Amino acid sequence: MKRPEKEAVVAQLTDKFRNADAIYLTEYRGLTVPQISELREKLGRDTSYTVAKNTLVRIAAKEAGIEGLDELLAGPTAVTFVKGDFIEAAKTLRDFAKTNKALIIKGGFADGTVYDAEGAKKLADLKSRPQLLAEFAGDIKATMSKAAYLFNALPTKAVRTIDALREKQEKAA
């Protein structure tokens, strides 16, 4: 690759680094082209799975202000640039690696933190944002239902007490 081509690749990678919400690094040695295509399809439209030279990835990451990826850039490395829900992308990579042993998750970068392989795999165990929001909404609804029951129970209890007193007075008379 000639220098102008390398500069163009670095510029593209730098742009991807700057626009990504998260980055995962994987070793793809042993994966076939159809397997890589399948992985790209599973990752979805908001995620790109890019194979590039480690030196170019290293330069682009530094230009984008991301430090600490050097240790992870050894051997054949593919970079997964994620826009949006990076937890879901981590789950997709983890599940794909389970069925395709050739894919090895090396680590990642999300929310300003560099993760090693174990850290990146732990991200896959977290609940996604939509799941957390659904649980939160369910908790709020349950709390509101309990409050409505309690507010309704007070007048009902008062009415029952008054009824019991009235019946007691009628029997006494």
Curated annotation (Swiss-Prot):
Coiled coil: none annotated. Disulfide bonds: none annotated. GO terms for molecular function: large ribosomal subunit rRNA binding; structural constituent of ribosome. Keywords: Ribonucleoprotein, Ribosomal protein, RNA-binding, rRNA-binding. GO terms for biological process: translation. The keyword Ribosomal protein applies. CDD domains: Ribosomal_L10. One of its GO terms (cellular component) is large ribosomal subunit. It comes from the Bacteria. PROSITE patterns: RIBOSOMAL_L10 (PS01109). InterPro entries: Ribosomal_uL10, Ribosomal_uL10-like_sf, Ribosomal_uL10_bac, Ribosomal_uL10_bac_type, Ribosomal_uL10_CS_bac. It holds the Pfam family Ribosomal_L10. Forms part of the ribosomal stalk, playing a central role in the interaction of the ribosome with GTP-bound translation factors. HAMAP family: Ribosomal_uL10. Belongs to the universal ribosomal protein uL10 family. Part of the ribosomal stalk of the 50S ribosomal subunit. The N-terminus interacts with L11 and the large rRNA to form the base of the stalk. The C-terminus forms an elongated spine to which L12 dimers bind in a sequential fashion forming a multimeric L10(L12)X complex. This is Large ribosomal subunit protein uL10. The gene is rplJ.
